[in-house]
Amino acid sequence: MADDKKTNEYTVEMDKLDHGNKNFEAPAPAVRPRGPPAAQLANNPILPVLAYCGSSILMTVMNKYVLSGTDFNLNFFLLCVQSIVCIVAIQTCKSSKLITYRDFNSDEAKKWFPITLLLIGMIYTGSKALQYLSIPVYTIFKNLTIILIAYGEVLWFGGSVTGMTLFSFGLMVLSSIIAAWADIKHAVESSGDATAKVSTLNAGYIWMLINCLCTSSYVLGMRKRIKLTNFKDFDTMFYNNLLSIPVLLVLTFLMEDWSSANIARNFPPADRNGILFAMILSGLSSVFISYTSAWCVRVTSSTTYSMVGALNKLPIALSGLIFFDAPVTFPSVSAIVVGFISGIVYAVAKIKQSAKPKTGVLPMSNPPVSASSQSMRDSLRS
């Protein structure tokens, strides 16, 4: 049928010949139509980059909104709701044939369950740290996890660290010191009970330290365990969220206060709908991050994706200044800038390592990984 159509386009109709001049002109070849606008839009590299950055900011801001309530203490319940929302969302996408992942297998679940426990420790301590710290400080301190992961790779997987990577680590530590100093300085100089504010910050720093340890343990453990399961793309997300739901349900009912008075404090009538909506949206945002990161890698490149992950630190930190009452001072802004530069230097160091021979290069930066694995690593750092 297509061949017939092409033939007809160049057929000369005899009754249209100019018999006087004995000349004739064939109709102009038909212009090949472009792809549909939707396909062109989907392949535009700007759109997936903006979508990835937006979903990262959305997740952080929604979590902070829920946790910033003065009396919110149902962290395990929040994480459970997010896991349930995530499972419902990806299962719906699978049923609609938008994504694919393997069906549940009990043997694979047993192999993956220890990683799920590490994940629960990571997301719980992360929620506690975000509850006590501002988004900019939380984002800056999250960079320290990169250092722990890098040296974990050196110790357990025989990797190495380049000079540029070490320089980026130094900038990360410096930005964290500046951020902590700016926070404590603002707490001491501001009106109100300075001692209570400093105590709150110290609690946040302790939770942040524990979170960095849990996050690095999770990433390193997942790297080793994934060789046994050969999980791809959304497989990891499916098992992580599915296996964490029963554990989180047990923890929330055993360790958290479910009295009517405490529920009223956590979900005041005036803000109840907004809090529940934010909890659901934060669960969906984790799906958005995985999907948009895979989209970003497919449309652009892994190099561009690495740079986007580094540049994404700045808008996430700025979102805390815009949407919440994070102090805007010269030291706090300086900490954000230094942390932003450290992320760029680290991304450039990773790109240069990837361009070199594989001998003696950190495994975390050299071997190809799936888009979901890469996005998970970056989302943990954001």
UniProtKB/Swiss-Prot annotation:
GO cellular component term of the entry, any: cytoplasmic vesicle membrane
Q: What is this protein called?
A: GDP-mannose transporter 1
Predominant cellular place of this UniProt entry's protein? Golgi
Q: What does this protein do?
A: Involved in the import of GDP-mannose from the cytoplasm into the Golgi lumen.
Q: Which InterPro entries match?
A: SCL35B1-4/HUT1 (IPR013657), TPT_transporter (IPR050186)
What broad taxonomic lineage does this protein's source fall under?
Eukaryota, Fungi, Dikarya, Ascomycota, Pezizomycotina
Provide ranges: composition bias, Polar residues: 367-382
Transmembrane spans: 41-61, 72-92, 111-127, 135-151, 161-182, 201-221, 234-254, 275-295, 304-324, 328-348
**Topology relative to the membrane:** Multi-pass membrane protein
Q: Which UniProt keywords apply?
A: Cytoplasmic vesicle, Endoplasmic reticulum, Golgi apparatus, Membrane, Sugar transport, Transmembrane, Transmembrane helix, Transport
Q: Which PANTHER family match?
A: SOLUTE CARRIER FAMILY 35
Q: Where is this region: Disordered?
A: 358-382
Query: Whom does it interact with, and what assembly results?
Result: Homooligomer.
Tell me where it resides. Answer: Golgi apparatus membrane; Cytoplasmic vesicle membrane; Endoplasmic reticulum membrane
Family per record: Belongs to the TPT transporter family. SLC35D subfamily.
> What Gene Ontology terms for biological process does this UniProt record contain?
transmembrane transport
Q: Which domain of life is it from?
A: Eukaryota
Tell me the gene name: gmt1
- For the keyword Transport, the answer is yes
Residues assigned to the Cytoplasmic compartment are: 1-40, 93-110, 152-160, 222-233, 296-303, 349-382
Pfam families per UniProt: UAA
Q: Which residues lie on this side of the membrane: Lumenal?
A: 62-71, 128-134, 183-200, 255-274, 325-327
